Amino acid sequence: MSNSQSEGKRQPAIVILDFGSQYSELIARRVRETEVYSLVMSYCTSADELRQLAPKGIILSGGPSSVYAERAPLCDPNIWDLGIPVLGVCYGMQLMVQQLGGRVEAAIGKAEYGKAPLQVEDPRDLLTNVESGSTMWMSHGDVVRDLPEGFVRLAHTANTPDAAVADHNRQFYGVQFHPEVVHSSHGIALIRNFVYHICGCEPNWTTTAFIEEAIAQVQAQVGQKRVLLALSGGVDSSTLAFLLKKAIGDQLTCMFIDQGFMRKGEPEFLMDFFDQKFHINVEYINARQRFISKLKGIIDPEEKRKIIGTEFIRVFEEESNRLGPFDYLAQGTLYPDVIESSGTNIDPKTGERVAVKIKSHHNVGGLPKDLQFKLVEPLRRLFKDEVRKVGRALGLPEEIVRRHPFPGPGLAIRILDEVNDEKLNCLRDADLIVREEIREAGLYHEIWQAFAVLLPVRSVGVMGDKRTYAWPIVLRCVSSEDGMTADWSRLPHELLERISNRIVNEVRGVNRVVLDITSKPPGTIEWE
């Protein structure tokens, strides 16, 4: 999302220039938490483009490069003449120093990673209410050796003399740590200082404001034409259904494609919920065998995602011809979906991505090139927590608002092998046990996602004095705020024991349960 058209008509108060950091969008989320709208754009964005956007502040993100490297990503040097306050974070600070006449070098023997106490020397402006000795998250192998003219030191750590710097006259600020991550204890205070006290922003990015703008944007985009919604029953598509119903009424047709990869009992729950409780008409399409046959012999996860995405569109196209005509396809694509599917930062000199592509999202990377619909994606500028707020404001019940995220390709990407009915039934039963036990323990709403994964191997076991040779199930439970980063959930041992015992005793074809204790990064939440 690097252009104002895809973001609607609202102009960003804060622009984040992305230099390839996996935390760039987290910066945007932290700014939005202050009720100020922010937009992530490529580091290639020109000073002229920024002048037209007229943001009140600019944040330069971190990144994996060194500013002195031959192909280091650089921002337009004319940005420094715009008269707009700038905050550089990690690489962004080093770039600011380098371009304004300072010097950055490799931190030989003194690279700093992880938590470090910040010693505040100047508590004005940026560091107001940031306590000296507070913990900040460091992640850098380079350090500033010489500050540019006009800059002063604001704070230091044990290994970083210039951990925070400023040119107060020009309102240029830099920090060598990451205030956006949860590990930085006073990071939010620092961001608020920059957004409110330095940039003078107003708190007008609210749920009510978004709903009003989104409705107006959809009405302007769609006009009197009809929209087909790909409804899955999760919080994203359900919120989208409520939003579109409010915006365009009977111009909306919801369609649920049962591709055979849903969790146990979900198709029935979905149809009852929308039809009986909220009287939103949903067309049910049973396409289970069609999807499973398309995945025959397919193991590669990227190929699975693209096949499922393509087949979804094909089914929608066929059904739209029967029910239509429809001009638009609505999707519950969110900001993290777009982020994980493509790096927006392409070096114009080398053609190389600065940010590494993680995996294609089924709503983004899986779309066929000959798509017959125009897309309506009013949620694509929101993070998951923002979607939940919108859903609540629109009247969506908590049982939907607080449901755990579920991938569009469903259980097909939780079977790390060829997909067939036997494996699907096995995984459905195991997954149901996981969710039942976590709900019974009162932990469901404390966990971001909890699910089972079926591995493509078999292990030896003994049951009833007989040798077994069956599949292992992986238990994956993570805690997160927005899905951008995640930590594995520390479940009570007694709960883990109950889950394991039930799965090996109740699920046919399984004789072993293992626990995934990998955080994101380095892993992703889903296995495929």
UniProtKB/Swiss-Prot annotation:
Annotated function: Catalyzes the synthesis of GMP from XMP.
Binding locations of ATP: S232, G233, G234, V235, D236, S237, S238
Keyword Nucleotide-binding assigned: yes
Annotated active site: C90 (nucleophile), H178, E180
Catalytic activity: XMP + L-glutamine + ATP + H2O = GMP + L-glutamate + AMP + diphosphate + 2 H(+)
Gene assigned in the entry: guaA
InterPro entries linked to this entry: Class_I_gatase-like, GATASE, GMP_synth_C, GMP_synth_GATase, GMP_synthase, GMPS_ATP_PPase_dom, NAD/GMP_synthase, Rossmann-like_a/b/a_fold
Swiss-Prot/TrEMBL keywords: ATP-binding, Glutamine amidotransferase, GMP biosynthesis, Ligase, Nucleotide-binding, Purine biosynthesis
Keyword Nucleotide-binding set for record: yes
MF annotations from Gene Ontology: ATP binding; GMP synthase activity
Superkingdom as given in the UniProt entry: Bacteria
Descriptive protein name: GMP synthase [glutamine-hydrolyzing]
Pathway stated in the Swiss-Prot or TrEMBL entry: Purine metabolism; GMP biosynthesis; GMP from XMP (L-Gln route): step 1/1
NCBIfam families: guaA_Cterm (TIGR00884), guaA_Nterm (TIGR00888), PRK00074.1 (NF000848)
Pfam families: GATase, GMP_synt_C, NAD_synthase
Domain named GMPS ATP-PPase: residues: 205-403
Assembly and binders: Homodimer.
